[in-house]
Design a protein with these regions (language model features):
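Beta1/beta-strand and adjacent pyrophosphate-binding region of the FAD-binding site
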Residues: 463
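…; additionally, a secondary subgroup of soluble metalloenzymes is captured
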Residues: 1-460, 469-619, 623-840
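Ligand-binding pocket scaffold of soluble enzyme catalytic domains
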Residues: 466
């Protein structure tokens, strides 16, 4: 009882305050209050008006009241209180007085409507749902939506939005909130709608906006309708019969809504959950089994569609059908298309792996040149990519949670790489390496210092990365070439043989002579060079202001510490060991391709840090040797037995005083390699086979004679000082569209410039909007990442589908382009919406 009394007092205070507001000002005012149910008849005496009197109107004193207000007292303000409903116009003798007076409403609905400026014709809606406004917080949330123009739908959507705590009065936002609850049959928002008699209103709006009609509407069936309608727009074939009944006639609205849901940072995870639910509920994999893969190429509603496309690609590769196409797209193009679609976060690695596998399978027809010069040239320009794609394949393969489904493909890749590529290449390589003039056909590692360092005036940093083979160096080249401050060139040189660390490191130092003692110790100018200090001593004999450092010692140094190292130095040798350190151990050799990726990133980051923080801008990156890696364990037939002998025996080479004359082995004199009269002989397999040696790993090897082991990169990098202007790849509309006349429109866009070191790849979101920023179409994603120099190859076609609604021909509509990264609007293009039967 006390609570009820307190509420009544609170209402009376609110009414008192509102009435005093009505009578503010100098001008005389008359305010009529028809208290339909005489709710305040006992309280009116307690009303305290600051600038008006209370006049009590009775049903039988209307004439006198009119006389009193218009003749007897024309000066004072009056609140005319009537404890009964307002009479009909014909029976109300004060109707003309009301025309220049004001009505006051004290029921909750009227107070609410007056406060917000809601037209009285919508009072029945407010009264029907007055229970909704009984809660202060809920009512405040309705106020906070700041609805500018009230109509029946906005009021309903406002109440739904208040329950769902949306930020705007948008039915799409309400639906997003409902779908995000996580439950289908027992949904907290749907239950709350029922509580406030808004349940049927919600489903009516679902029919109006999305065309969802059901005798007994349910959230499950609504979600099915959304997803199947969305799927229908991108499946080029005919939908299976079992799904056709779920396709809504309001496809434009659904496509726009679903695009926004799928592409939203806030909702994309929920989209994925809903997609999985629908896929399982309808057994989409089974339902789509009779559709052709090309009919699903552009559909990314469900992740299981990716599984269908992936299975098709794998089957084509296993059949070595590299010319197979989907909708006139090659396998590599299909991989590119699908890897940019919605589920790429979970499927991207698989597509990248398949793309690499494709390049390996193409190599099944590998033809190796006959001459050594041609072998060198072909390797530097194209063959290195086979090794690179083999590395990429395993990098992605090893990162999969479950790679068992691709075991047959892995076996094919391994077989082609080893038997069709390596075996053919190494046989001819090792025939050429023994030719008399071979060592004059390209720069030699043993001449590195004289060819690259001697005579340089600028401070130079030489980064020697252990086992950084040519193809990995080429990836580093690609990474740095995209840096606008980088001016970079890549060359190659032929390493010493045997191609192992101690001899390779010696060859990179300045020297007058390199020798190998009888106990196989490598000496530079007669001095040991097997550690950092001894190498520094040798380096300083040729360059006073020089130093040798380990990468691990400087990688985390602060700016001041880096400057202390480099200040006053003319030459710095940095020794980096990521690849060899991982590959040379049996328990980590299968991680070598991960190490390659890490090495590229570490070296690129180090160059940028030193350039920015240590006033050093010239860098040379090279390696002591490369490596061969094969995943399958070696068979005993791949191992060459070595008889007991006094020799330096490694898996890929033997150094001894005598040549080995056996099948599969070639020999070269150490004196020829080191340019001296050393009588020792280097023996090496002419294939990728190894000598049988105990201990260590077997898959990662180096020291032998192959392009993979002996062709090492030499990257010459100059980093520009200061700021370099860069910009995003721009896009422009090619299609001369001024008027939209169809619910589905295809437009062409061009990427203005090719991606380069100063033009950065950019992702754009494109969609149509009204002048009040309402999205009226689906959202298209354009990846402006083409490096094609031919402008015709940088043209993209995008499909747009419009909301099913009425469009005002006199209103402004635009195609807008947004930078996905920054969210910034890049441009907008004005169009007239002239959809037949839809505009007004």
């Amino acid at each position: 009882m006390e609570s009820s009394k307190a509420m009544a007092e609170l209402n009376l205070k609110q009414i008192n305050a509102r009435l005093n507001e009505e009578f503010r000002g100098e001008k005389r005012k008359l305010v009529f209050w028809y208290d339909d149910k005489a709710e305040f008849a006992n309280d009116i005496k307690d009303i305290e008006l600051d600038n008006a009197n209370v006049y009590f109107l009775q049903p039988d004193n209307q004439f006198y009241t009119k006389y009193f207000l218009e003749r007897k007292d024309k000066e004072n303000n009056y609140l005319i209180y009537a404890p009964f409903p307002k009479p009909d116009v014909r029976e109300n003798h004060l109707e003309d007085t009301l025309l220049y007076s004001k009505r006051f409403f004290a029921d909750r609905a009227s107070l609410f409507m007056a406060d917000l400026g809601v037209d009285e014709k919508y009072k029945n809606i407010i009264e029907k749902h007055i229970k909704f406004f009984a809660n202060k917080d809920r009512t405040q949330r309705f106020y906070d939506l700041e609805i500018e123009q009230f109509n029946e739908e906005n009021i309903i959507v406002g109440m739904l939005g208040s329950i769902c705590r949306t930020q705007t009065c948008s039915f799409e936002e309400v639906v997003r909130a409902v779908l995000s609850d996580g439950e289908y049959e027992v949904n907290k928002f749907i239950d709350t709608f029922k509580k406030y008699d808004l349940h049927s209103e919600f489903w009516k709006l679902c029919e109006r906006h999305f065309g969802y009609i059901d005798n007994i509407p349910s959230l499950t069936n609504f979600v099915l309708t959304l997803f199947i309608t969305y799927t229908a727009k991108s499946v080029t074939g005919e939908l299976p019969e079992s799904l056709k009944s779920m396709v809504s006639h309001k496809s434009g609205n659904i496509i726009t809504f679903m695009d926004n849901l799928k592409n939203s940072v806030l909702y994309k995870d929920r989209y994925n959950e809903l997609s999985e639910f629908v896929s399982n509920e309808l057994n989409i994999v089974k339902v789509f089994e009779n559709l052709l893969p090309e009919e699903l190429l552009y559909c990314d509603t469900f992740v299981c569609i990716d599984k269908i496309i992936i299975r098709w690609i794998e089957e084509r590769l296993l059949a070595e059908d590299t010319g197979a196409m989907l909708d006139n797209h090659s396998i590599k193009e299909v991989v590119s298309i699908r890897s940019k679609m919605h589920f790429s976060e979970s499927t991207g690695k698989v597509y990248h792996m398949l793309g690499s596998a494709y390049d390996i399978v193409v190599s099944a027809k590998y033809v190796c040149p006959d001459s050594f010069s041609d072998i060198l040239e072909k390797y530097k320009t194209s063959d290195y990519k086979i090794d690179q794609n083999y590395r990429y394949f395993y990098y992605d393969y090893d990162s999969l949670d479950d790679s068992e489904d691709f075991e047959r493909l892995r076996e094919l890749v391994e077989n082609i790489y080893t038997n069709e590529y390596l075996d053919k290449l190494l046989q001819k390589w090792n025939s050429g390496i023994l030719e008399e003039n071979t060592l004059s056909k390209l720069p030699l590692q043993i001449d590195f210092y004289d060819s690259n360092i001697g005579g340089l005036k600028d401070r130079t940093v030489v980064i020697i990365s252990d086992a950084l083979r040519y193809e990995v160096g080429h990836e580093l080249y690609t990474v740095l070439a995209d840096d606008p401050k980088s001016n970079i060139r890549i060359d190659t040189s032929l390493s010493v043989l045997p191609s192992y660390t101690r001899l390779g490191m010696a060859a990179l130092l300045p020297h007058k002579s390199i020798t190998m003692s009888d106990d196989y110790t490598v000496l530079v100018d007669g001095m040991s060079c097997d550690n950092l200090l001894t190498r520094q001593n040798i380096l300083q004999r040729y360059c006073d202001n020089s130093i040798c450092v380990q990468f691990d010692d400087i990688k985390n140094m602060k700016k001041s510490e880096l400057r202390d190292i480099f200040t006053g130095k003319q030459l710095v040798y940095v020794y980096h060991n990521q690849i060899d350190a991982r590959g040379d151990k049996a328990n980590t050799e299968d991680e070598v391709f991960v190490a390659c990726k890490e090495a590229v990133n570490e070296i690129a980051d180090l160059i940028r840090r030193i350039s920015s923080n240590a006033n050093t801008h010239h860098f040379i990156v090279t390696a002591d040797h490369g490596f061969i890696y094969k995943r399958d364990k070696l068979n005993e037939s791949d191992k060459i037995n070595v008889r007991d002998r006094n020799a330096f025996v490694n898996r890929r080479f033997i150094v001894s005083t005598e040549a080995i004359y056996e099948d599969g082995i070639e020999n070269i004199s150490m004196g020829r390699i080191l340019r001296n009269d050393d009588g020792k002989v280097v023996s090496f397999p002419i294939s990728s086979n190894v000598f049988k040696v105990s201990g260590g790993g077997q898959n990662f090897v180096h020291g032998g004679s192959s392009p993979q082991e002996m062709l090492i990169p030499v990257l010459n990098i100059k980093m520009e000082r200061g700021h370099i202007d860069t910009g995003n790849a721009q896009i422009a509309l090619v299609s001369m569209v001024q008027k939209i006349t169809s619910n589905v429109t295809v437009l062409e866009f061009i990427q203005s410039e090719a991606v380069s070191d100063t033009v950065k790849a950019t992702t754009y979101k494109l969609y149509f909007i009204s002048d009040d920023n309402e999205k009226i179409s689906n959202e298209a994603t354009l990846f402006a990442d083409s490096r094609e120099l031919d402008a015709r190859k940088r043209i993209f076609r995008m499909n747009f589908r419009f909301k099913d609604k009425r469009y005002d021909k006199n209103k402004n509509y635009y195609l807008a382009a947004y930078d996905e990264g920054s969210g910034e609007e890049i441009w907008r293009h004005h169009v007239v919406m002239d959809l037949v039967g839809e505009s007004f």
